[in-house]
């Protein structure tokens, strides 16, 4: 169930402050964040975030297509190694 429109998108307060500072100084520094639950807003477009996946920080460059999604959607937490093969191919 999506968030109510009257509440508006959630962006962590500390992350919002970092975005304002990055926009005012026009720096190209990567913004480090643990806030995977924050929604991508139009003010974030063009900035690079280092989003924590539980083990390390994954760099995420925000584009217009990402607006409305959560930052955590772009840094996967689980590594997929592929499905198990058949036993016949393993015996040979």
UniProtKB/Swiss-Prot annotation:
Superkingdom of this protein's organism:
Bacteria
Q: Where is the signal peptide?
A: none
Q: Name one GO molecular function term.
A: rRNA binding
Its GO biological process annotations read: ribosomal small subunit assembly; translation
What UniProt keywords are attached to this protein's entry? Ribonucleoprotein, Ribosomal protein, RNA-binding, rRNA-binding
GO cellular component annotations of the record: cytoplasm; small ribosomal subunit
Classification via Pfam families? Ribosomal_S19
Its function, per the record, reads: Protein S19 forms a complex with S13 that binds strongly to the 16S ribosomal RNA.
Question: Into which family does the record put it?
Answer: Belongs to the universal ribosomal protein uS19 family.
Protein name per UniProt:
Small ribosomal subunit protein uS19
Native source organism of the sequence: Desulfosudis oleivorans (strain DSM 6200 / JCM 39069 / Hxd3)
Q: What is the lineage of its organism?
A: Bacteria, Pseudomonadati, Thermodesulfobacteriota, Desulfobacteria, Desulfobacterales
